[in-house]
């Protein structure tokens, strides 16, 4: 999402571990003069839920300065995936040219802001996984699922 609203990827991201092959990200880097022109004008505002990449060098100051779309960043302060201080909060701070807000779920992990209903099958213990698959969707501190209405 950060790239879609004007944030250009860093040069380091083009060849980083996990980057797409053939330098595909080079078309969306901050150094590419066409990046600013590729922001869809229909997007008037955005919500970035736990955006990933800052902690791995996919974003830098130059790239984040390209964000000009108003954006609400949502993150958990205990996010172990996107990170908080060095991840989402750093992206928020770096988007200096955008009207922006940061909503922090205190002590929440990566999934707190994403109320994705878990498939019913994930509530059963998996012998193969030696855990409950639901834990992939759950947050121990913030339960963002809608309350059950079945009785």
Predicted feature locations:
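Primarily recognizes the serine-hydrolase "nucleophile elbow" in alpha/beta-hydrolase
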Residues: 1-60, 66
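Active-site-adjacent alpha-helix of alpha/beta-hydrolase-fold enzymes
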Residues: 65-148
């Amino acid at each position: 999402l950060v790239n879609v609203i004007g944030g250009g990827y860093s040069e380091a991201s083009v060849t980083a571990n996990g980057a797409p092959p053939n330098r595909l990200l080079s078309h969306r880097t901050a150094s590419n003069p066409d990046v600013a022109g590729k922001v869809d004008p229909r997007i008037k505002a955005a919500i970035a839920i736990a955006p990933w990449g800052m902690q791995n060098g996919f974003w830098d100051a130059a790239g984040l300065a390209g964000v000009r779309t108003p954006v609400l960043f949502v993150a958990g302060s205990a996010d172990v995936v996107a990170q908080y201080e060095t991840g989402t909060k750093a992206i928020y701070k770096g988007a200096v040219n955008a009207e922006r807000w940061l909503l922090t779920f205190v002590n929440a992990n990566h999934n707190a802001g994403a109320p994705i209903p878990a498939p019913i099958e994930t509530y059963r213990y998996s012998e193969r996984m030696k855990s409950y698959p639901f834990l992939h969707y759950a947050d121990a501190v913030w339960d963002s699922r809608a309350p059950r209405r079945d009785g």
